[in-house]
């Protein structure tokens, strides 16, 4: 008897599993609050050099700025330079001594802002950019905050993946909760950018535990029939978090209090672990039969399933545990040992890199669309709901491969057409940005389903772990690609769209899995490949 048969006895989907999904909803909601937090946390408001003796009389301020600040090519005042000497502005009298800028002498040479900056605080009262003047020569540091965070997620994913297999999902989930809470509070109390960068990187590592542990902890208590439904249901919690971030960001305009607001809910999450069950499958692989028996009996009781006395006896569970332990632990090298599996793994790595790169690249670019940042964030969250409906319908009728390629192609086209729109603030540009975000979310949802069906059962978790790892690398590089706007304003969009297009073409190289039986072993994957080649040869001959 295997573990799937045990689940049939105690109920593979019922009140026990629904309660588990509800208890694990909190980390899914909190993840986007942290992953997309740089939209508000690291925002750079309009700014200009702080000037000496700026007049209080508003009617004279424009003339005063004209005397001190050079203009950019688009006619706006420079954000990073001021004139070395005030320039002449005719027929205007300013200053405490009654001088007019027309009386002031000096050439038109400029210099950096030596007295700091003044910021437009109408949208944000405080961000890390205004806190530590991360503008002009230091602007890259503001954008790099996202990269530091995602690098932490990348490292944490590797660590939590290994440790949760060794010490258990529930115990490591507690570690993730506590460490994320402590490090999040430390980030909010940062006294320097260096301290903030370090604590945010470590916070990313801690939160990676949620991404690695929560999904297996849900799926390992579900029967095969309900795993896809549960996966789609769980993904809506992420969408809820995306929209919730818009509300929280709107209500809290100071970055320290905002960081506290998204960190403190981790505390009740720690308490909720009292009711979260450990994975009985993992317990059996470790030979901890008594604990597994206790959780399985609890599952049967909550699901209202009468269990035969010998069905969950220690002897029966010991036999299952022995069967689970004799299976050789898979390694990442197994994903590349055979031709077909190597092909699938390499293609999935490209697809996941493209999906993450385009998703986070667009999700973090919420300024300059003709709406304020809060409206844009809400729109970006709301469009994810119809995106999930699109995926649900498309994978059933068009198939997984075409859906994956089509959604990535849609994201690439939306980004490409935006390059042709004259104004970023036009309604067309805004609509295309929302469409691109919707397609990238649809590609993300499809990738989870498609990838899980491509890998055989013995390597499914290993394959998902590898592709997720490469995907997080794409998420780490996405904020850095935004720095390319210093070379050409549209270059970041070209990068996001180009990578999405490459991933779309790569997805077409993957085999279709619609209505196909899931492979159990590596041999099943290779055997299917040979069958497809034989069918292709017959079609060519006929």
From Swiss-Prot:
It holds the Pfam family Sugar_tr. One of its GO terms (biological process) is prostaglandin transport. GO terms for molecular function: alpha-ketoglutarate transmembrane transporter activity; organic anion transmembrane transporter activity; prostaglandin transmembrane transporter activity; sodium-independent organic anion transmembrane transporter activity; transmembrane transporter activity. It catalyses: orotate(out) + L-glutamate(in) = orotate(in) + L-glutamate(out); 3',5'-cyclic GMP(in) = 3',5'-cyclic GMP(out); GMP(in) = GMP(out); 2'-deoxyguanosine(in) = 2'-deoxyguanosine(out). The chain crosses the membrane at residues 21-41, 144-164, 178-198, 202-222, 228-248, 257-277, 346-366, 373-393, 402-422, 430-450, 464-484, 491-511. One of its GO terms (cellular component) is basal plasma membrane. Keywords: Cell membrane, Ion transport, Membrane, Transmembrane, Transmembrane helix, Transport. It comes from the Eukaryota. It is a multi-pass membrane protein. PROSITE patterns: MFS. It is found in: Basolateral cell membrane; Apical cell membrane; Cell membrane. Functions as a Na(+)-independent bidirectional multispecific transporter. Contributes to the renal and hepatic elimination of endogenous organic compounds from the systemic circulation into the urine and bile, respectively. Capable of transporting a wide range of purine and pyrimidine nucleobases, nucleosides and nucleotides, with cGMP, 2'deoxyguanosine and GMP being the preferred substrates. PANTHER family: SOLUTE CARRIER FAMILY 22 MEMBER. Belongs to the major facilitator (TC 2.A.1) superfamily. Organic cation transporter (TC 2.A.1.19) family. This is Solute carrier family 22 member 7.
